[in-house]
Structures are given as structure tokens and as C-alpha cells.
Swiss-Prot record:
The presence of a 'disulfide through disulfide knot' structurally defines this protein as a knottin. Residues 1-22 form the signal peptide. Ion channel inhibitor that inhibits the increase in intracellular calcium upon depolarization in DRG neurons. In vivo, both intraperitoneal and intracranial injections into mice induce hyperactivity. InterPro entries: Conotoxin (IPR004214). Disulfide bonds join 49-62, 56-67, 61-77. GO terms for cellular component: extracellular region. This is Conotoxin Tr6.3. It is found in: Secreted. Belongs to the conotoxin O1 superfamily.
Length: 79
């Protein structure tokens, strides 16, 4: 009987602490997916265009740059 009481009280306590934690952390994670998406877009390797000095064989150069033949035979983004 005592063991059953202790188990019931501990389950109620753990459930209450989980609910309190969930309510507390809800506002902190509201836009987490959008923030991670924006961070991925800003990474240097995730850009859609090649910057000055980068190769332009597999992707186009950024606006204002043109693809010029490089010394190794591949194209390089230059002004």
C-alpha cells in the first residue's frame, strides 16, 4: 500500500514538473525552425551564386561578376 502511494505521488510530481517545463519553454522555441532556416541561408556554402574568386562551373556568378577562364581550365567569378 505504501509503495503504491509513493508511486502515484511520484508520477503526479513528474507529470506536473513536465507540464511546468513545457509551458515555460514554449515561448523560447517559437520561431526556432525559421531561425535555423535563415542561418542555413547565410552560410557561405549555401549561397546560390559564386562570389569573387570562386568557381563558376556548377553555379552562376553573383550579380556584377562574370565567369572568366581560370588558369586550371575551370571558370572563376571575376569583375
Amino acid at each position: 500500500m505504501k509503495l503504491t502511494c509513493v508511486l502515484i505521488i511520484s508520477v503526479l510530481f513528474l507529470t506536473a514538473s513536465q507540464l511546468i517545463t513545457a509551458v515555460y519553454s514554449r515561448d523560447k522555441q517559437q520561431y526556432r525552425a525559421a531561425r535555423l532556416r535563415d542561418e542555413m541561408r547565410n552560410l557561405k556554402g549555401a549561397r546560390d551564386c559564386g562570389e569573387q574568386g570562386q568557381g563558376c562551373y556548377t553555379r552562376p556568378c553573383c550579380p556584377g561578376l562574370g565567369c572568366r577562364a581560370g588558369a586550371t581550365g575551370g571558370g572563376v567569378c571575376q569583375q
